[in-house]
Swiss-Prot record:
Protein name (Swiss-Prot/TrEMBL): Cell division protein FtsZ
Compartment(s) of residence: Cytoplasm
Annotated organism of origin: Shigella flexneri
Domain of life: Bacteria
GO cellular component: a single term: cell division site
Gene Ontology molecular functions: GTP binding; GTPase activity
Keyword Cytoplasm: yes
InterPro entries, alphabetized: Cell_div_FtsZ, Cell_div_FtsZ_CS, FtsZ/CetZ, FtsZ_C, Tub_FtsZ_C, Tubulin/FtsZ-like_C, Tubulin/FtsZ_2-layer-sand-dom, Tubulin/FtsZ_GTPase_sf
Keyword Lipid metabolism: no
Binding site for GTP: G20, G21, G22, G23, N24, G107, T108, G109, E138, R142, N186
One GO-annotated biological process of the protein: division septum assembly
UniProt lineage: Bacteria, Pseudomonadati, Pseudomonadota, Gammaproteobacteria, Enterobacterales
PROSITE patterns, A to Z: FTSZ_1, FTSZ_2
Complex formation: Homodimer. Polymerizes to form a dynamic ring structure in a strictly GTP-dependent manner. Interacts directly with several other division proteins.
Membrane-spanning parts: none
Length: 383
């Protein structure tokens, strides 16, 4: 007699916020209802964990810090994480992909994030870190700690996306409030996680499976991400151009990227020609040797808007792989039925359609590990 078997082939994605900055970023993601992922907050500060809206929390280093935080000392943060490696391992086990969100420069995020990444890699998990660098006004010492932390973190992750807060300040304008500035940084962190995770977790006309994502992001080093939102007749071309247009990219040769992951998010009116337009726009800057993966996800709240998220990986790496073609899988089940079957609540999208790109001539050297793109939905706030 045959028994019905429940298929459990969905990739397990976990997002770990480390320290105060990482915890705030993950809390922001929880409020924005990013679906299909599990959230954790890791901190030495017991009070911060008690106040967070993140459902699963891990206090590390209680024997060292007594729950009072790392005192802006990365060494204390690292020792705290080392003390509770077993708890971190238990939280990470079973994941196929882990995002680590952290603010570099402080004690816990800077010191503990590399340990979390090391544990994840030891478990064979695809590990991606999305971190911020401090504002210049936070001081040279904090910036030095951040640089050291990023260097250490890069040794233990598959891909590393770095967001320099000071570049955000230049784009958003000096009149922005401190609260809004940090909020913009959280939005970029959310955008990176959301853009990648939705490719796997949300239904679409062209599906990307976990193996495709692993191909683009595994062992790739420094990465950049960008996002653009537009509406109207030319929304596909405009959103794609905005996603790859950034002042940070002026001195960076993106043709050296070894992998490019593209997520097109729109309502049920998304057209095939629009997907083709986005693909052609992205391939115009990508190397012929790069692995380009394009997928779609559907969000009925987008209405007339279309969002393009691009993650380019392996930037600055000398060795390039042979050309790899990735074929997107057509969904056999009707998209609307599959969407409802998953019981997914639509995301709230508050960005307004934008077609204007703000340029910034701030110099960027090829040696700096700031290979990322500031999404257009952040740049629009400068208008």
């Amino acid at each position: 007699m045959f028994e019905p078997m429940e298929l459990t082939n969905d990739a397990v994605i976990k997002v770990i916020g480390v320290g105060g900055g990482g915890g705030n970023a993950v809390e922001h993601m929880v409020r924005e209802r990013i679906e299909g992922v599990e959230f954790f907050a890791v901190n030495t500060d017991a009070q911060a964990l008690r106040k967070t809206a993140v459902g699963q929390t891990i206090q590390i280093g209680s024997g060292i810090t007594k729950g009072l935080g790392a005192g802006a000392n990365p060494e204390v943060g690292r020792n705290a994480a080392d003390e509770d490696r077993d708890a971190l391992r238990a939280a990470l086990e079973g994941a196929d992909m882990v995002f680590i969100a952290a603010g570099m420069g402080g004690g816990t995020g800077t010191g503990a994030a590399p340990v979390v990444a090391e544990v994840a890699k030891d478990l064979g998990i695809l590990t991606v870190a999305v971190v911020t660098k401090p504002f210049n006004f936070e001081g040279k010492k904090r910036m030095a700690f951040a640089e050291q932390g990023i260097t250490e973190l890069s040794k233990h992750v598959d891909s590393l996306i770095t967001i320099p807060n000071d570049k955000l300040l230049k784009v958003l304008g000096r009149g922005i409030s401190l609260l809004d500035a940090f909020g913009a940084a959280n939005d970029v962190l959310k955008g990176a996680v959301q853009g990648i995770a939705e490719l796997i977790t949300r239904p679409g006309l062209m599906n990307v499976d976990f193996a495709d994502v692993r191909t683009v992001m595994s062992e790739m080093g420094y990465a950049m991400m960008g996002s653009g939102v537009a509406s109207g007749e030319n929304r596909a071309e405009e959103a794609a151009e905005m996603a790859i247009s950034s002042p940070l990219l002026e001195d960076i040769d993106l043709s050296g990227a070894r992998g490019v992951l593209v997520n097109i998010t729109a309502g049920f009116d998304l057209g095939l020609v629009e997907v083709e337009t986005v693909g052609n726009t992205i391939r115009a800057f990508a190397s012929g040797n790069a692995t380009v993966v394009i997928g779609t996800s559907l969000d009925p709240d987008m209405n007339d808007e279309l969002r393009v998220t691009v993650v380019a990986t392996g930037i600055g790496m000398d060795k390039r792989p042979e050309i790899t073609l990735v074929t997107n899988k057509q969904v056999q089940q009707p998209v609307m039925d599959r969407y409802q079957q998953h019981g997914m609540a639509p995301l709230t999208q508050e960005q307004k359609p934008v077609a204007k790109v703000v340029n910034d001539n701030a110099p960027q050297t090829a040696k700096e590990p700031d290979y990322l793109d500031i999404p257009a939905f952040v740049r629009k706030q400068a208008d």
